[in-house]
């Protein structure tokens, strides 16, 4: 069977998916183990009817709304492939900017103790631990299920880390030179306009927060300096609508901070120090 014949099948099932031709190519690549070059040149695919039936079954799952990354159990993030499933959020490209800024600042330096809160898949913490000289890495999350995914990814990339089930700092001990956090920050009223695939498939616990999405962020800002060394840094992601509110909270706390924008020129994360 030729690639184009298989692609016709895929496009039929993916007709209501945005960028369906691109996804059809990804399905063929990931299911049959072909390169995009093989797909472009319409290579022959050696496959049984059983394999075609399984392929169609996965297409049907995608057509029902399940995110592609949960079907094939991975997401590319900062030049690495992370395992993901329904226990964790799918990493977003904007979060790579936080990782990149942190790497730019700490490249060539040694970090004694590093904490990644709300770690989810571990994509932030494991990326930084892979790129930087960090002596001690702690990945923490309120969800035991999320920590299992983070453990799997840490094993894949040979990262030695401590894993702690913790509601923010509830089970955290000691001070850290670097803290990163990508907390639940989506305002609850955004539920009615978010993509249905996000609402139905991604863990809502890791997405939404009360008080215009600021409830967990406010708690973190109140507590973080007790766990940060004098010259330590915090990098925190937030919703594009929250820049002014976060600036006000940090000005009241009298800490140094700088807000950074994402690819769409929207406020997206903050770098801040202690008191």
Place the predicted regions along the sequence by residue:
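Conserved hydrophobic residues forming the short capping helix/wall of the S-adenosyl-L-methionine
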Residues: 14, 106, 154, 224, ...
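Conserved AdoMet
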Residues: 30-104
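Mobile active-site "lid"/loop adjacent to the S-adenosyl-L-methionine
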Residues: 185-216
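Conserved Class I SAM-dependent methyltransferase catalytic core
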Residues: 83, 211-273
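Conserved SAM/SAH cofactor-binding pocket of Class I
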Residues: 97-193, 197
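Non-catalytic accessory regions of SAM-dependent methyltransferases
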Residues: 1-32, 39-40
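Residue-level signal for inorganic ion chemistry
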Residues: 27, 65, 95, 124, ...
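Active-site beta-alpha loop architecture of Rossmann-like, nucleotide-cofactor-dependent enzymes
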Residues: 69, 186-189, 241
């Amino acid at each position: 069977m030729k690639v184009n014949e298989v692609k016709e099948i895929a496009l039929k099932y993916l007709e209501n998916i945005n960028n369906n031709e691109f996804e059809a190519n990804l399905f063929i690549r990931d299911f049959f183990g072909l390169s995009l070059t093989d797909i472009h040149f319409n290579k022959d695919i050696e496959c049984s009817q059983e394999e075609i039936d399984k392929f169609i079954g996965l297409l049907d799952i995608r057509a029902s709304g399940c995110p592609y990354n949960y079907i094939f159990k991975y997401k590319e993030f900062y030049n690495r492939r992370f395992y993901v499933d329904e226990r964790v959020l799918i990493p977003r490209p904007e979060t790579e900017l936080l990782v990149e800024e942190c790497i730019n600042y700490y490249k060539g330096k040694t970090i004694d103790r590093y904490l990644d809160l709300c770690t989810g898949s571990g994509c932030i913490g494991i990326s930084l631990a892979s790129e930087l000289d960090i002596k001690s890495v702690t990945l923490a999350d309120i969800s035991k299920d999320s920590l299992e995914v983070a453990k799997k990814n840490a094993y894949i990339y040979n990262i030695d880390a401590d894993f702690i089930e913790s509601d923010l700092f509830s089970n955290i001990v000691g001070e850290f030179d670097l803290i990163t956090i990508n907390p639940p920050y989506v305002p609850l009223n955004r539920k009615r306009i978010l993509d249905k695939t996000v609402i139905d498939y991604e863990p809502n616990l890791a997405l939404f927060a009360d008080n215009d999405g600021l409830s967990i962020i406010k708690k973190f800002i109140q507590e973080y300096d007790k766990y940060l060394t004098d010259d330590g840094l915090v990098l925190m992601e937030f919703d594009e609508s929250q820049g002014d509110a976060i600036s006000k909270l940090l000005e009241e706390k009298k800490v140094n901070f700088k807000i950074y924008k994402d690819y769409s020129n929207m406020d997206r994360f903050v770098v801040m120090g202690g008191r």
